[in-house]
A protein has these predicted regions:
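Conserved AMP-binding/adenylation subdomain of ANL enzymes
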Residues: 208-226, 233-302
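Structural core segment of the AMP-binding/adenylate-forming
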Residues: 84-164
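Conserved ATP-binding/catalytic segment of the ANL
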Residues: 380, 385-445, 567-568
């Protein structure tokens, strides 16, 4: 299917809906017991005024704006205003300014970005940011930038002469008219934690093309969308795909301040009891928590399924045990199946490059097939295949990093993703691509045999039948494969949990006896993955490399002789 024509600028969608339905609610953010909202018409007016203020303060296509903020109306307004005025917006993970964050990481990122200013509305975040970058101007108040208050700049590094003097939107309108598809709309930093951060240039063409791809693959599911979404806008899936889905289709996003983590998920459940989504996005950890709540709360489940059209899982397919639970819930509360689809992509592909879609969709255990306009190459890398991508939704490269840009593309212009994959059926590509995890996360045993950590994780969780919430594998250059197992909170104190984990791994090993799939030893982690220590990514998945680093003592115990009493042998 060819890709249809798409708008030239992502902000054209805001203009379209501001004219077509100016009073329709675009975004909603909880304030205590009520929801604060902003309409498409009001958003456009604020965006134009703030865009002019940002230009007057020194922003340009070469001087981006850093944004360190939780999701919300002000965050969205600032991002749209910068993009409207031709200033690249760079949402940065709030993890960079949390109390235990290493300031050197933020310094390195800002050294690459070279912003003219930063928007940091939270006082504690602003103090930590200012301590790291004392010379950088900090905007703290979106209303002030729009001309609603007396001042717009924080005291950190700002003089009275730095304060934007104009709220006339004409300068922003002129800048917007000069934008084209190649103009950089955003700069998103890759989540890798080693080396110098890389800022991915996201152009207006990438964003617009990717939303048209979404429209073509799931046309009925995304019409008039209502989203209740927690995923951080510093991450490509939420900031580009989910936010863009609402903007393109004139829908409404309810910003969820919760997330799939202990102590924070109750906020998500509260929001879902009030607001019924039509499109819902989550990660495997989030699905497990959500299904547990849906199965025990009739009111929640009734609301959740009342107008739900599609569920999108980030990354590869969810375990069959979770899928079966979902199907049972959907039949009970909706009276029909609700599609659970997978898609794949990364920051450099805007993000969506493949999806389960079409009249004859790919098999559900795959990441689907290329979306319209996208080409996928399976390139041999040693004894595996790397997924490489070409199309209008692929980045032109990395911000201020010509060397990394040149290394990112092959001789045919395909972007080298670093992800492994293979056709489910080489004789029938339409059956889809099986995701093989990150090439860098896979490893070799001492025998030279590769361990595909991504696929193995799904198999072990499936064998756990609810006993194993997540798992991280060790064994690089070792004789045997071992595992650190994370169990659900509800089972952590179950006296039978060790035996349940042992039995689950034994079931897995019986079906997967090869050295690259058989788990020889395991231990149950004493603590769940710690986001503050980098063990959980912004999108809620477990960071395998960081877990192994932080829990090196556990890895040593797995291979120690004589074997300790905490070690489980399936």
């Amino acid at each position: 299917m060819p890709l249809r024509q798409y708008p030239e600028r992502v902000t054209d969608d805001l203009i379209r809906w501001a004219r077509a339905k100016p009073d329709a609610v675009f975004l909603a953010e909880r304030r205590g017991e009520t929801w604060e909202t902003i309409t498409f018409g009001a958003m456009l007016q604020r965006v134009r005024r703030i865009g002019a203020a940002l230009l007057a303060a020194g922003g340009s296509h070469e001087r981006p704006l850093a944004i360190v903020a939780e999701n919300g109306i002000d965050h969205a307004t600032i991002v749209l205003a910068a993009m409207y005025a031709g200033i690249p917006a760079s949402p940065i993970s709030t993890g960079y300014v949390r109390p235990d964050a290493d300031p050197a990481r933020l310094q390195a990122l800002l050294g690459v970005l070279q912003p003219f200013a930063a928007f940091v509305p939270d006082a504690a975040y602003a103090d930590r940011f200012a301590a790291t970058a004392p010379a950088l101007h900090l905007f703290k108040d979106a209303s002030a930038l729009a001309g609603d208050n007396a001042s717009a700049l924080a005291d950190h590094g700002a003089s009275n002469g730095d304060r934007p003097a104009t709220r006339d939107p004409s300068a922003a309108d002129r800048a917007h008219a000069a934008l084209g598809g190649d103009s950089v709309a955003k700069i998103l930093f890759t989540s890798g934690s080693t080396g110098t951060p890389k800022g991915v240039m996201i152009t207006h063409r990438m964003l617009c093309a990717n939303q048209t791809m979404l429209e073509q693959v799931w046309p009925d599911a995304i019409r008039d969308p209502v989203l209740v979404d927690w995923a951080p806008w510093s991450h490509v899936a939420a900031g580009n795909k989910n936010f863009g889905l609402v903007l393109r289709n004139g829908g409404t996003m309810f910003v969820d301040a919760g997330k799939p983590a202990p102590g924070a998920f109750d906020t998500t459940l509260r929001n879902l009891r009030e607001i019924a989504p039509t499109f819902y996005f989550n990660v495997p950890r989030g699905w497990a928590l959500l299904f547990e709540a849906l199965e025990s709360d009739d009111a929640l489940a009734t609301t959740f399924f009342s107008r739900l059209r599609i569920l999108l899982n980030a990354g590869a397919s969810i375990p069959e045990s979770l899928r079966a639970r979902l199907n049972a819930l959907a039949q009970r509360y909706a009276g029909h199946d609700v599609p659970v689809v997978s898609a794949w992509g990364l920051t450099e592909t805007a993000p969506m490059a493949t999806a389960v879609w079409g009249e004859r969709p790919a098999e559900r255990e795959t990441i689907g097939t290329p979306v319209p306009g996208v080409e996928i190459k399976l390139a041999p890398v040693e004894d595996r295949y790397e997924l490489r991508v070409r199309g209008p939704s692929v980045t032109p490269g990395y911000w201020r990093n010509a060397e990394a840009t040149a290394a990112a593309f092959d001789e045919d212009g395909f972007f080298k993703t670093g992800d492994a994959g293979a056709l489910l059926d080489e004789s029938d590509p339409s059956r889809g691509i099986v995701f093989g995890g990150r090439l860098a996360e896979n490893f070799k045993l001492s025998s030279g045999t590769w361990v595909n950590a991504g696929l193995l994780r799904l198999d072990v969780i499936e064998a756990g039948e609810g006993t194993i919430e997540d798992v991280v594998f060790a064994g690089a250059d070792r004789d045997e494969l071992t595992a650190i197992v994370f169990v659900p909170r509800a089972l952590a104190n179950d006296p039978a949990i060790r035996e349940r984990v042992r039995a689950a791994l034994a079931r897995h090993n019986e079906c997967n006896p090869a050295s690259s799939t058989r788990v020889a030893r395991a231990l149950i982690a004493a603590e769940p993955p710690n986001g503050a220590h980098g063990e959980i990514t912004d999108k809620g998945s477990v960071n395998q490399r960081r877990v192994l680093q932080n829990r090196a003592a556990d890895v040593a115990r797995l291979y120690a002789e004589p074997r300790g009493s905490a070690i489980i042998v399936p």
